[in-house]
Amino acid sequence: MCDRNGGRRLRQWLIEQIDSSMYPGLIWENEEKSMFRIPWKHAGKQDYNQEVDASIFKAWAVFKGKFKEGDKAEPATWKTRLRCALNKSPDFEEVTDRSQLDISEPYKVYRIVPEEEQKCKLGVATAGCVNEVTEMECGRSEIDELIKEPSVDDYMGMIKRSPSPPEACRSQLLPDWWAQQPSTGVPLVTGYTTYDAHHSAFSQMVISFYYGGKLVGQATTTCPEGCRLSLSQPGLPGTKLYGPEGLELVRFPPADAIPSERQRQVTRKLFGHLERGVLLHSSRQGVFVKRLCQGRVFCSGNAVVCKGRPNKLERDEVVQVFDTSQFFRELQQFYNSQGRLPDGRVVLCFGEEFPDMAPLRSKLILVQIEQLYVRQLAEEAGKSCGAGSVMQAPEEPPPDQVFRMFPDICASHQRSFFRENQQITV
């Protein structure tokens, strides 16, 4: 049975906020209370005050569970969410001839559409359910604002007023590993051949792409310097390189395989903000990521400080998202029956907050990253556990032992991975 209460949540909530007189500029436009004003000041204005001008948008984000105190403030995103909901809800209609956007205290005017009028427009017999709008149903401009960072003007207007994330949740600042790389062909470490033999197990990554929760492609990286996840073709004339020349390019699979036309459209829209991509590097210490693209990127991994809440990667910052030593410690505890099998995966979510309460199938683009060696250890641990045997795993395997174990593990678990439209067997 259709639940019509879901579509009334915004209407009821907004009327309550107007009547509360708690939000400056949010007032009734007429005595009949059929129209209302909502403040609409641009975040780039010199006199923009986040606490005042974004208060109603923040309140909606809190109500929807998209923001809680201590999270990083994102006024532009809050505003886009409410605008999207207003524009798509049958309960509201913008009255453009009453809106004033060119004055010092700009505002928009919306009319509350009576239910009888809605029925006349839709037809009682074919009205169907009026459910609360989702972000996937936003128009092009709304989607564009939801998935990318605010413009430079917006950002500069709000940066002084946006509280930083709590100190406890801030990642440690790390040196830019990629910026320190020498030219192609120069050894990264003295005696590089030996180094490569011992550490290739940790430098190789298995990268899996999920669109709408479905696996659409996989790749394994082989370059010790790391890789760049991007959409652009390598080596095209006039193409600007982002990162060292020696980086391996792993391309996002095309959106053609997505069955839903609407999802394909939105995914391709998101692609437009991922041109510069992200850089990935894997080593004995763990997995590191540097976001270069304009589109927002969120992540999860065992090295993320704050678990169970959205973790946004700041642009041009190097962040450790996976700690290999921590994985080994937890794996040892698992073998000693002192803990669960540790998760060796890192997940990047492009354009949408993650992790959150939304199911993974609702996410447009998820990229899962695993160190190949860690992946094989986890598989072996799962098998040994299922067989009832206990395999002793050293907390920190010596390099020579790693090098001996690695070929054997890989030989027994051959599989094909997708990269650059080729099948690659490891």
Curated annotation (Swiss-Prot):
Check the UniProt entry and state the signal peptide residues, or none: none
> Which keywords appear in this protein's UniProt record, sorted alphabetically?
Activator, Autophagy, Cytoplasm, Disease variant, DNA-binding, Nucleus, Repressor, Transcription, Transcription regulation, Ubl conjugation
| Effect caused by changing residue 81 to K | In a breast cancer sample; somatic mutation
CDD domains in alphabetical order: IRF
From which domain of life does this come? Eukaryota
* Phenotype upon changing residue 197 to T: In a breast cancer sample; somatic mutation
Q: Name one GO cellular component term.
A: cytoplasm
| Pfam families xrefs | IRF, IRF-3
Question: What does the entry state regarding organ or tissue expression?
Answer: Predominantly expressed in lymphoid tissues.
Ranges of the DNA-binding region feature:
7-114
Q: Which residues form a coiled coil?
A: none
Task: Note the effect listed for residue 80 to A.
Answer: In IMD32A; impairs transcriptional activity by disrupting the interaction between IRF8 and DNA
InterPro entries assigned: Interferon_reg_fac_CS, Interferon_reg_fact_DNA-bd_dom, Interferon_reg_factor-3, SMAD-like_dom_sf, SMAD_FHA_dom_sf, WH-like_DNA-bd_sf, WH_DNA-bd_sf
Induction cue = By IFNG/IFN-gamma. Negatively regulated by microRNA-155 (miR155).
A GO term for molecular function: RNA polymerase II cis-regulatory region sequence-specific DNA binding
Disease the record associates with this protein: Immunodeficiency 32A: An immunologic disorder characterized by abnormal peripheral blood myeloid phenotype with a marked loss of CD11C-positive/CD1C dendritic cells, resulting in selective susceptibility to mycobacterial infections.
Family statement drawn from the similarity comment of this UniProt entry? Belongs to the IRF family.
Oligomeric form and interacting partners = Interacts (via C-terminus) with TRIM21 (via C-terminus). Interacts with the BATF-JUNB heterodimer. Interacts with BATF (via bZIP domain); the interaction is direct. Interacts with COPS2. Interacts with SPI1.
Q: What is this protein called?
A: Interferon regulatory factor 8
